[in-house]
Amino acid sequence: MKFVRINESDISSERLNGETIIISFSNGSYYNAAGTAADLLFLISKQIHPEMWSEILAKAFSGYGEDSDHITVFIEKGLSEGILKLTDEESLIRKVIDLPNDTVRNNWIEPKLDKYEDFQDLLMVDPIHDTTEEGWPKLNDE
């Protein structure tokens, strides 16, 4: 298993009602991680060692553990999108924690990271140098 952490230098994220919205400053995309994906990102953000995830997730979701490849695929996607980055094992905490009490959890489903690119042009704009005198979001034609 790869050891990962949130790539805080390139993204901003916020969790609300069991969903995490992520904005990438490096590519202008934004992402939605709901349910199981939001909970995995929560565990990663708290730097919980992956050895602890099974106990935490099995307590929260029925059917967890039937397909462990889901987590590997999710982590690979997060790495390829620049949302996650590799870290060393020593920086991770071996502790069982509670997941946020902001959603109802039922069955384990494959964690998905939905990517959206419809605001890339606006998110990648330098508001000082790339806009007209009228300001953002009025872009220079250059």
Annotated model-derived regions:
Residues 1-26:
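Long, low-complexity, charged/polar intrinsically disordered regions in eukaryotic proteins
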Residues 29-142:
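Long, charge-rich, low-complexity alpha-helical segments
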